A protein has these predicted regions:
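Hydrophobic single-pass membrane-targeting/anchoring helices
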Residues: 1-40
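Short glycine-rich, low-complexity/disordered patches
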Residues: 73-80, 127-138
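Extracytoplasmic low-complexity, Pro/Thr/Ser/Ala/Gly-rich segments
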Residues: 30-100, 188-195
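Extracellularly exposed regions in secreted/surface proteins, prominently low-complexity, repeat-rich
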Residues: 132-195
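Extracytoplasmic/secreted proteins, especially bacterial periplasmic and envelope-associated proteins
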Residues: 60, 64, 111-118, 186
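A short acidic-to-branched-hydrophobic micro-motif
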Residues: 95-116, 171-177
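Extracellular/mature segments of secreted proteins
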Residues: 81-84, 96-103, 135-138, 160-163
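Conserved polar/disulfide-associated segments of primarily extracytoplasmic proteins
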Residues: 112-134
Length: 195
């Protein structure tokens, strides 16, 4: 492995480890949780795709992001195994937008399911607002007869979290409220208008 490859692998592992820490770090709200988050295991290795392919995948993913992310709000992350591209985004500026988000682009349905399961692994499941099944299928209003993906609602370190897949775009999206909001119903309403 070249020195550049080693550095890229070390950076990738550090970013994934930081992401796992961020998603599982304790907060004061965790003391009140009845069920602690599931423990995480070792991080996934970084893919070894070429720069051109990674760049094309990154651009494709950024074009598919929900509205409300201004220029510079998202940064590209090294993609874990099975993921073509991944970005970490700061606060969405639309009303009741999430405080933070991670969006992933995958190549196939098996990778979509794996990335979805990884995204929800360190959360505590709840029904979505309105007593909507979680996890469960979701549909677009324009195509109510066709499942668009899977939807999941939960808490990550006491913060409302919505995770969903989009089978057409081949994306997994995980959005999270911050300590000051939005509330779960607000975040769910944002998802409903941005998915």
């Amino acid at each position: 492995m070249t020195p550049v490859g080693i550095v890229a692998a070390v950076i990738g592992v550090a970013v994934v480890a930081g992401l796992i820490f961020w998603l599982t770090r304790p907060s004061q709200d965790d003391v009140q949780q009845a069920t602690p988050p599931a423990p995480t295991t070792a991080s996934a290795p970084v893919t070894t795709t070429t720069t051109a392919t990674s760049s094309e995948s990154d651009e494709r993913l950024v074009r598919q992001l929900p509205k409300g992310y201004p220029s510079g709000a998202c940064e590209t992350l090294p993609a874990p195994e099975g993921v073509l591209a991944q970005v970490n985004c700061a606060r969405n500026v639309d009303p009741d937008g999430p405080e933070s988000a991670i969006f992933s682009l995958v190549a196939d349905r098996a990778s979509l399911e794996n990335a979805f399961n990884d995204a929800i692994a360190a959360t505590v499941r709840v029904d979505c607002p309105g007593k909507i099944q979680s996890p469960g299928p979701w549909r677009r209003n324009a195509t109510p007869d066709r499942v668009s993906g899977q939807l999941y609602c939960g808490f990550s370190n006491g913060q409302p979290t919505v995770v969903w897949t989009d089978e057409e775009k081949m994306t997994v999206s995980a959005v999270r409220a911050g300590p000051t909001g939005p509330t779960f119903p607000q975040l769910y309403a944002w998802w409903s208008s941005h998915s």
